[in-house]
Amino acid sequence: MNPDAAAEIIAGAAASNPDAAMELVQDIMASDPSSAAEFAASMAEANPAAAALATEAIIEAAPEQAIEATAAMAEVAPAAAGAAAEVMAELAPDQAGEAAMAMQEAAPEAAAAIAGGVAQGNPEVAAEVATEMAAADPEAAADIATGVAVAAQVNAAQEVAAAQVEAQAQVADATADLQ
């Protein structure tokens, strides 16, 4: 089967059955790690929403190809860069900075999404990565800062929502104890 056709089929299937798609991608990448970047780029080009799945599969099956693959995805599908950066920061924080820099070089227009993705995936490495990105491209510094700020707002909103759920559960327990 043509690798581009396989990538397109799997990228399309990722929305309906992500677990099966993940297994297929991991098997393909493990069988030929040298083609992982090309395969991931084909997936992202076919469906940018599949970038997170492709990135996770690469980290699991061919981690040495992860930086090259995320850059390749960003180059062909800049809309995929944020999701790829988020997964890299979450699952491979030691490689997050290098991957973000490679993605930024491949798709400078995605700098905000890349920085935001890193901040979403791992807030602990976000400042360091954003600083490296801004130093590499000072003209993108405002976009990079915006990406991190938006991600921080999302992270804070998620923490508030989780706290509200916990508080409601405690109120329900206390109310039940009183009755």
PLM regions with names:
Residues 1-179:
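General marker for long, soluble alpha-helical cores
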